[in-house]
């Protein structure tokens, strides 16, 4: 689009800045660096994959890590141990249950298909180092998404509550509760008024 404007010789009323940044998937440090360098604009368009749709809202993202403790034991005396992997699966199911609850309660007008907007899932499980022994720890890493207007602290608390409830149903975890921490990627959800001039201008030109 910018190339076409330049080739046409059209004169714009303002400046157009093309900013190519790194770190889009993890933390947005590239965009932050742009701001810290003093670049400002009346409006911006993020060229995120959208199927060429105008998207005036952006979900938030909270990464978390859950440490589940078991009791190590060798294969012959495994009955003396507590398999942290078995416990980990219970917590994985609890996180899945939280997603189902959120699908029924979290709504946003710009996200009619809410299942695409608010994933709550475990994407990584780390446990054990030897095939013939119960591991004493299981580390689960996952992601929780929020919609604009949603309280991030409340969303985090819902995860803590769900994990705690699941742990209370297990005799071992009741006495050895999993440890939840929020670490890594964290981004607040955001949106722009659909009546904002930049949104209406892009819509009218598209």
Language-model-detected regions and their locations in the chain:
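Acidic/histidine-rich catalytic neighborhood of metal-dependent amide-processing enzymes
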Residues: 1-59, 63
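Metal-dependent amide/peptide-bond hydrolase catalytic core
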Residues: 56, 63-206
């Amino acid at each position: 689009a910018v190339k076409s404007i330049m080739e046409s010789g059209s004169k714009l009323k303002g400046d157009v800045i093309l900013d190519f940044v790194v770190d889009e998937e993890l933390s947005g440090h590239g965009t932050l660096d742009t701001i810290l360098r003093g670049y400002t604009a009346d409006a911006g368009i993020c060229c995120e994959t959208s199927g060429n749709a105008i998207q005036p809202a952006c979900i938030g993202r909270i990464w978390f890590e859950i440490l589940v403790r078991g009791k190590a034991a060798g294969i012959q005396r495994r009955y003396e141990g507590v398999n942290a992997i078995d416990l980990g699966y219970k917590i994985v199911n609890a996180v899945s249950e939280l997603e189902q609850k959120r699908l029924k309660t979290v709504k946003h007008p710009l996200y009619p298909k809410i299942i695409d907007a608010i994933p709550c899932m475990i994407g990584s499980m780390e446990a054990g180092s030897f095939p013939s022994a119960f591991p004493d720890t299981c580390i689960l890493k996952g992601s929780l998404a929020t919609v604009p207007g949603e309280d991030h602290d409340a969303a985090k608390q819902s995860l803590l509550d769900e994990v705690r409830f699941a742990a209370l149903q297990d005799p071992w975890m009741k006495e050895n509760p999993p440890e939840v921490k929020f670490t890594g990627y964290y981004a607040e959800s955001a949106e722009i008024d659909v009546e904002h001039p930049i949104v209406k201008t892009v819509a009218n030109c598209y």
